């Protein structure tokens, strides 16, 4: 029976890893559909290469920083318990690699290629796993300190703060230091419209992300005996809540409608194992409305050119999710309890502060040394031709 359980656990978390790996295709198509036609190839190449760099760096450095585990041992040791530690690494890597995928959407259309790969290596090798280890591996006694202070540890079941808020708040300094796309904001105060280039691909990306998210949340249990149908249904309710709120607040804009489920899912990650499904519906709905309102505000009023709205989507909805776990996870609102609002506020604030500090330091250093931005000419030509020397649909075809 023990051998069967070990095999089942390894399969369970492997399937989760595969589902979250598929989410990276979702990130790619969501970005492809949102950016202008001249930057579509760049969106695809960025997501794949960021994932590849993330894998190597997380295997060699990042996983060890978070969990104190080294893979520099014989394969015989690694294969123990059906290779459970290896597939656990695979699963958690897909989370780590989501951070550069999130940032990619914010800095689209004008960022240089290789400086961002360097940023990916630093983020996945140190910045993200440092905070991941604090929350999910009890490092530096921070969780014990929060528990002594508030009576409960900071609870983030599937990463509203650890993954999404950290990714979104890392992206904000990158977007600010990079500056807006050329001619995005006019001297008279007007804003040039850059509508999504391909709504069907944007929708495809959103759907792939949404389906994969059930692996992201449910498989965060990490062993099959801890699987919870509550997590699955709460994810579903938050997804539809986010969609309907974005539909209403966004006035049936298809870009907002397809980001709505993502906003809801970002927010429900932290407390999906605690909330009542109706609580999850409310959390998702608030996130959907929050995304639409803050995307419009950042782009039009504050003139922060965050192309995919990754700061509102992941940064703010993730922050809301961290706090919401402390509200809707409580027994008073039908949750399972065992969570403290003050602990959630402390842990959420720590994640945001760490990401902002690290983001400004990293991207500020890269801007000073390598430069972050394409030249005006390269940006005008488009990242596809200036970086990759080919467009999404080349105009010239060879006459055979």
Residues of each region from the PLM?
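Hydrophobic alpha-helical transmembrane bundles of multi-pass membrane proteins
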Residues: 1-400
């Amino acid at each position: 029976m023990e051998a069967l359980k070990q095999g089942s656990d390894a399969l369970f978390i492997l399937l989760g890893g595969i589902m979250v790996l598929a989410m990276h295709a979702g990130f790619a198509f969501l970005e492809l559909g949102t950016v202008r036609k001249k930057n579509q190839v760049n969106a695809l190449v960025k997501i794949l290469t960021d994932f590849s760099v993330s894998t190597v760096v997380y295997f060699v450095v990042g996983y060890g920083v978070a969990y104190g585990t080294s893979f520099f041992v014989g394969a015989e040791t690694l294969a123990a318990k059906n290779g459970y530690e290896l597939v656990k690494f695979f699963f958690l890597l897909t989370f780590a690699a989501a951070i550069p995928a999130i940032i990619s959407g914010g800095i689209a259309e004008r960022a240089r290629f290789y400086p961002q790969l360097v940023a990916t290596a630093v983020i996945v090798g140190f910045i993200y796993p440092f905070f991941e280890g604090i929350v999910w591996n009890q490092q530096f006694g921070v969780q014990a300190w929060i528990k002594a202070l508030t009576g409960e540890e900071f609870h983030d079941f599937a990463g509203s703060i650890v993954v999404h808020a950290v990714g979104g708040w890392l992206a904000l300094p990158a977007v600010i230091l990079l500056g807006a796309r050329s001619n995005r904001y006019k001297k008279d105060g007007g804003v040039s419209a850059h509508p999504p280039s391909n709504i069907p691909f944007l929708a495809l990306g959103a759907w792939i992300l949404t389906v994969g998210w059930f692996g992201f949340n449910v498989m965060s249990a990490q062993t099959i005996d801890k699987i919870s149908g509550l997590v699955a249904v709460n994810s579903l309710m938050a997804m539809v809540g986010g969609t309907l709120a974005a539909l209403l607040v966004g006035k049936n804009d298809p870009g907002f409608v397809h980001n709505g489920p993502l906003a809801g899912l970002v927010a429900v990650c932290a407390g999906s194992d605690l909330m009542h499904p109706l609580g999850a519906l409310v959390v998702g709905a608030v996130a959907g409305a929050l995304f639409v309102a803050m995307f419009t505000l950042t782009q039009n009023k504050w003139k922060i050119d965050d192309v995919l709205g990754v700061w509102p989507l992941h940064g703010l909805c993730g922050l809301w999710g961290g706090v919401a776990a402390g509200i809707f996870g409580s027994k008073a609102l039908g949750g399972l309890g065992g969570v403290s609002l003050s602990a959630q506020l402390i842990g959420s604030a720590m994640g945001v502060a760490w990401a902002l500090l690290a983001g400004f330091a990293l991207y500020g250093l890269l801007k000073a040394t390598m430069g972050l931005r394409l030249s005006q000419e390269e940006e005008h030509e488009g990242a596809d031709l200036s970086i990759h020397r080919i467009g999404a649909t080349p105009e010239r075809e060879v006459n055979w």
